[in-house]
């Protein structure tokens, strides 16, 4: 994880209800949080709390931003705008060796979250505060141990 060295940590977090869409098309509401830490400027977290333990998925902030407008992603995380119950929602499709899940998030909540994120670190400026010499040093140190 690349660390943004000069940005004060103003973490953005937005709680929201996430609809898990079953294979039968039924929806189950799960408490969730979208989280962005400017110290890790390229990533966002989707934290799901279906029970006692939280499940966290980390993926690119740019992927989320693209996915609210057009289908985005080709790997374990795919994001696209869709219609559900007469409104536009953001569908996040997650795949792992243990299974697959389609989740629906309110587009208005995701859009507001991204606006707050871009207020902390504007799109295209994620790497401006990264100490690249330190990152290289850490990579080389890790490789040599």
Swiss-Prot record:
Family statement drawn from the similarity comment of this UniProt entry: Belongs to the SsgA family.
Superkingdom, taxonomy of origin: Bacteria
Pfam families: SsgA (PF04686)
GO biological process, alphabetically ordered: division septum assembly; sporulation resulting in formation of a cellular spore
Gene Ontology cellular component annotations, sorted alphabetically: cell septum
Record keywords: Cell cycle, Cell division, Septation, Sporulation
Name of the molecule in the record: Sporulation-specific cell division protein Francci3_3418
UniProt-annotated location(s): Cell septum
């Amino acid at each position: 994880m690349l660390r943004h060295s000069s940005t004060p940590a103003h973490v953005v977090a937005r709680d929201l209800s996430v609809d898990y869409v079953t294979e039968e098309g039924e929806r189950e509401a799960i408490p969730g949080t979208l989280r962005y830490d400017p110290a890790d400027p390229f990533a966002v977290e989707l934290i799901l709390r279906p029970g006692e333990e939280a499940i966290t998925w980390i993926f690119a902030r740019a992927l989320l931003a693209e996915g609210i407008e057009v289908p985005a992603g080709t790997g374990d995380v795919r994001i696209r705008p869709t219609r559900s119950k007469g409104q536009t929602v953001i569908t996040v499709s997650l795949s792992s060796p243990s299974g697959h899940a389609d989740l629906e998030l309110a587009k208005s909540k995701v859009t507001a979250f991204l606006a707050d994120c871009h207020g902390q670190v504007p799109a295209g400026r994620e790497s401006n505060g990264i100490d690249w010499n330190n990152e290289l040093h850490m990579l080389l140190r890790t490789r040599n141990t």
